[in-house]
């Protein structure tokens, strides 16, 4: 059954948030799972009586006292927690605390399904080389931009078979973030995370659609979307030697114009080891996923398999070619000089693709400690894939993989319990893209819960999702187009240039972090409050494909039947 999805439904979110959000009750503005944890934050230095009132009847359905008040240092706030987990009936409710403005909330069996569809559809809105028609894009329809059929080889990428200035084709793909360039390294974790969502929630995605041009074909919408980027990634490999170009870019960032108005020459820049390894890992996983869809995508699984192996071979011969930004290029670098985690991740994916033991041996030789995943720290991704296919491992290997994941998850669960806000975010998590840190921590907790089911893991996962959806010091849903209050001025060129008041929906803003590298005007330097909803703030209000991917994953996770969490 086709699930209708109208982008027009997202334009109603309020544009501005209160000057003093600390004085407000904080809830998950998208709602709570009927069988899940339900927490709200009450500011103040003492316990508070609270009650939940059913709407529209006005009946009081739950009363209790909040927890002991505690200081949450990242926000400089003393707060207590209202826990109404016992309330499980679906419906609209009002949370009431004397002295505070009441706040409405929703309890539902699937409160996040529509939000999920918007978060994944954000990738459609960021497609390069395609016109967005009103039938699919609504008011955000636009002409095609960047056909990328006349891309030049930059001097940094020149080779005997492709000298400087050679013209090549490299269409499709997703614009990386607020800019219009395309980067292999950042596409690595982004594309992998979406493929992993397919792997972990296959039944959900077989029946879920969100109105993209491919929705009527015989492929799941998720894989159609991912293929748009995989096809571009495939074109970024030099067929002569298997090396992979680091990025497709203009020399400098374009201005705040629509994609079809950004017409500066674009280039393929430098082959790097990091690009080759990200490419190898993603193409190996994609080959496994697409093997089921040979009729719809003939030859593609075999092509991606071959390309993954060739990229690995190139990286093995060139293990330390790091990205060096050319003097005439000023766009994103995605530089990384610690590649042991990329080697281990790619080795794990190639082992699962080929079944060849040397790849598995390479994984265990190169494996790094598990950390919260990011584009520069991908050690956990190989563990995730091996844990999913643990029957292929010896008992000793299986235990090593499992314990590497669960040990970190135990730390995150402890952070949740210790937090006054009941969110597993500590000061060092408030970095560029802090909201993606929250979502990637939640993914790790989900993976751990699949190994050993623990209520503490699920509670910490929910706490992290609550945080980005409104239960935070700014009383802000960080996803455009949703909640009572959400970002209106994201650092995203189409949203800035399209003359539409509302931003493109479904994008997760980067989030609070004290670096303030953009030199915009902020109201606070506190880690969890250092955020400004302004186009100028690329340090806190940009959107990127790698930040949205873990949000998509977690919204899919929380759209599963509760016993499967």
PLM features per residue range, with description:
Residues 237-246, 320-323, 355, 414-417:
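Proline-centered turn/helix-capping motifs that create local helix->coil transitions or kinks
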């Amino acid at each position: 059954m086709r699930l209708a999805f109208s982008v027009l439904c997202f334009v109603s979110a309020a544009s501005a948030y209160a000057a003093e959000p600390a004085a407000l009750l904080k809830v998950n503005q998208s709602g709570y799972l009927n069988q899940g944890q339900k927490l709200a934050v009450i500011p103040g230095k003492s316990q508070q009586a609270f009650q939940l009132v059913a709407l529209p009847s006005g009946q009081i359905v739950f009363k209790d006292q909040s927890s002991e008040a505690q200081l949450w240092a990242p926000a400089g706030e003393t707060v207590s927690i209202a826990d109404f987990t016992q309330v499980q009936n679906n419906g609209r409710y009002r949370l009431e605390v004397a002295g505070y403005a009441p706040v409405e909330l929703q309890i539902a069996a699937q409160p996040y399904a529509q939000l999920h569809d918007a978060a994944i559809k954000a990738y459609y809105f960021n497609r390069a080389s395609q016109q967005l028609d009103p039938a699919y894009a609504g008011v955000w329809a636009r002409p095609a931009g960047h056909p990328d059929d006349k891309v030049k080889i930059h001097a940094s990428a020149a080779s005997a078979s492709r000298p400087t200035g050679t013209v090549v084709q490299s269409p499709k793909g997703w614009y990386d973030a607020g800019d219009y360039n395309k980067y292999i390294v950042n596409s690595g974790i982004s594309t992998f995370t979406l493929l992993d969502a397919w792997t972990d929630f296959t039944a959900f995605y077989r029946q879920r659609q969100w109105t993209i041009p491919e929705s009527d074909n015989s492929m799941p919408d998720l894989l159609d979307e991912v293929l748009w980027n995989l096809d571009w990634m495939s074109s970024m490999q030099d067929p002569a030697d298997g090396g992979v170009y680091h990025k497709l870019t203009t020399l400098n960032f374009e201005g705040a114009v629509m994609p079809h108005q950004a017409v500066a020459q674009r280039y393929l820049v430098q082959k790097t080891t990091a690009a080759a390894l990200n490419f190898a890992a993603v193409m190996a996983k994609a080959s496994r996923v697409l093997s089921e869809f040979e009729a719809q995508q003939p030859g593609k699984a075999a092509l991606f398999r071959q390309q993954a192996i060739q990229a690995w071979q190139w990286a093995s011969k060139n293990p330390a070619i790091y990205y060096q930004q050319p003097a005439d290029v000023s766009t994103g670098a995605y530089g990384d000089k610690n590649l042991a985690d990329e080697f281990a991740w790619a080795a794990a994916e190639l082992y699962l693709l080929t079944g060849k033991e040397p790849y598995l041996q390479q994984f265990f030789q190169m494996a790094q400690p598990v950390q919260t995943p990011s584009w520069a720290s991908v050690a956990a991704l190989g563990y995730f894939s091996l844990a999913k296919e643990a029957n292929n491992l010896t008992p000793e290997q299986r235990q090593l993989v499992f314990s590497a994941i669960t040990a970190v998850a135990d730390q995150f669960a402890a952070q949740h319990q210790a937090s006054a806000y009941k969110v597993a975010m500590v000061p060092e998590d408030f970095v560029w893209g802090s909201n993606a840190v929250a979502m990637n921590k939640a993914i790790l907790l989900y993976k751990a819960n699949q190994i050993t089911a623990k209520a503490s893991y699920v509670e910490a996962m929910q706490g992290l999702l609550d945080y980005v959806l409104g239960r935070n010091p700014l009383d802000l849903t960080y996803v455009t187009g949703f909640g009572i209050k959400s970002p209106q001025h994201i650092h995203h060129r189409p949203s800035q240039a399209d003359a539409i008041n509302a931003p493109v929906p479904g994008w997760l803003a980067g989030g609070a972090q004290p670096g303030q590298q953009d030199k915009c005007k902020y109201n606070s330097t506190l880690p969890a409050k250092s955020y400004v909803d302004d186009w100028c703030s690329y340090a806190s209000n940009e959107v990127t494909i790698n930040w949205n991917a873990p949000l998509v994953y977690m919204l899919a996770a929380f759209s599963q039947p509760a016993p499967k969490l």
